[in-house]
A protein has these predicted regions:
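Catalytic cores of enzymes
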Residues: 1-167
């Protein structure tokens, strides 16, 4: 399930490059580690790129374009509160991604720590590479943090939520 990566760092992580990669690169998993904001008002919902904001409508359009040719198996939104919604849209950016055609989205329920999240993601991806289903990989990454003295507090392991298909 783990693809050969195509990576956009810093100034390469532009609105144009991100949307082009999402359209053209046949990855089954896309990992976006950035900052974002969610609101039930689409104009106030976005992910941050190097050169500005990737509006939720753009993300929605790009994901819908992939549905027939190359549907996205897993979209990882490694940013604060990507699965936290409001009274009008309860699943936040993660829910929008599912409605737009991603089979599954991994999001967060609250503000996350960059260092611990990077370590958590390594464990999650190691679990996927070992052949675990998405939900199992999530659970086992959480359990490994729960058993770690440094990251046993729920702040570090509990914000991650899988929305959509769990297998």
């Amino acid at each position: 399930m783990v693809d050969t990566p195509s990576i956009l760092f810093n100034e390469q992580f532009t609105q144009r490059n991100v949307t082009q990669k999402l359209r053209d690169y046949p990855a089954s998993i896309v990992h976006l580690a950035t900052h974002g904001q969610f609101s039930s008002d689409a104009e106030k919902t976005f992910l941050l790129a190097w050169d500005g904001q990737i509006n939720v409508r753009t993300l929605d359009q790009v994901l819908k374009e992939r549905i027939t040719l190359n549907p996205l198996e897993l979209l990882v939104l490694s940013a604060c509160q990507t699965a936290q919604g409001d009274e009008q849209a309860i699943l936040g950016l993660a829910g929008i991604a599912i409605r737009s055609g991603a089979h599954s989205t991994l999001g967060t329920l609250w503000t996350i720590n960059d260092r611990s999240t990077a370590e958590w993601m390594v464990r999650f991806y190691q679990n996927l590479a070992a052949g675990q289903e998405k939900a199992e990989a999530l659970r086992n990454a959480q359990l490994s943090f729960l058993q770690s003295p440094e990251y046993a507090h729920p702040y570090y392991w509990a914000p991650f939520i899988l929305v959509g298909q769990w297998h």
